[in-house]
Amino acid sequence: MAQNDKYILFISMNLISSSPVNRRNFLRGTGLCLALPFLESGASKALAAVEPARHKKILAIGNHLGFYPGAFFPQEEGMDYVSSPTLKNVEKHRKDFTVFSHLDHDVSGGHGGVNSFLSGVRKQESKGFPEKNVSLDQIAAEHVGSAARFPSITAGIGEGTDMCWTRTGVRIPPVNSPARLFNALFTQSPQSERIIERERLTHRGSVLDALMGSAKSLQGRLNGFDRDKLDQYLTSIREVEHRLQMSKEWLDRPKPEPGIQPITDEQRMHIEEMPLFFDLLTLALQTDSTRVATFEIPLGFSTTDLDGVSYGYHGLSHHSKGEDKLTELQVAEDYIFSQVNRLFNSLQEAKIFDDTLVIVGSGMSDGSRHSNKDLPVLMAGGGLKHQGHIVSPEEHQKRVPLSNLWLSALQWFGVERDDFGKSTGTFSGLNFS
């Protein structure tokens, strides 16, 4: 696999120690930068004739700037709500999704709070949590393990929106090239390249073994605080070792036939990239190349490529309820949800919609106010009996954490755990059984 078909995972260790340890000598070998096989994949109608593997899947779509509340949330509760302007784009699938009101993570910070969308925990406050700000998709990916070529796929436009995080607090950046994603999914490397890659993986495994030995030799010389830091570091090494082993297992297995023409590496408008990514993600899920995928829409999404839009996306989000900007903002949000509608159609045609839990939303509710309260959240597919519009309590003492919904989603996926993020239990408003 070519070098550009990888992502970089950084492992670092901060030993803040009063113990008599030569920290400089030890850390000289721990600033490790490993290139691991690209954990990403893609999809489309092209394989509609293929009978897909029946495994539960998760696909989460995050939009950095949220969706204008006045056009997103319905006024009525239950199945008989009148579609809001934004939801009219997915009206065909009304029975296939649920919209949630008054759910959030009780965080603030505007743009700085968006990174908590799939984790429930802001990166800035993650040190106080045993699993840091690990995101829903990465917990699900751990559950998948080596059962799929890519435990998870993180895709997106541009720089994405800081949505996916490991349990050690490391951000997983999105692959932002449809061509690179296509190659990772469907282009089989020549045997000569696979031999070289296997040698690289073996060498990296040897380096990790050496680091593990050096780290363990310190355990008896550290105080309690530093031992905790060391345990976190050892956990990071074990995670990477596990990924290296999975990479070796899949190295010589043939990749599926995509059923579509190869995607070339060329300059495209953002509005051209989004449907390409959605097709690739559908194919990735359908071919069981992955069972967990995410897609990130950034603050810098190029809305001026749309007819009738003259403002940039960030500028539109600061509408102050001005009529001109709200009109153009609706054009942008209509486009995004028209692509979501197209994605739902593709998942149905691929016969995997009932096996795939699709999450659409944001860690930002209203970009104009930089609010992280009352987040826009839609959940579709998954074979659930959807409830239309669920309105949770608005009073502070009765509010339901969004993490409760994420915990229920993880349990639906097969993950056995009783808490996630800042959850207080599972979400009782929607039956996941």
For each feature predicted by the language model, list its residue ranges.
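Ligand-binding pockets and gating/stacking loops
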Residues: 8-433
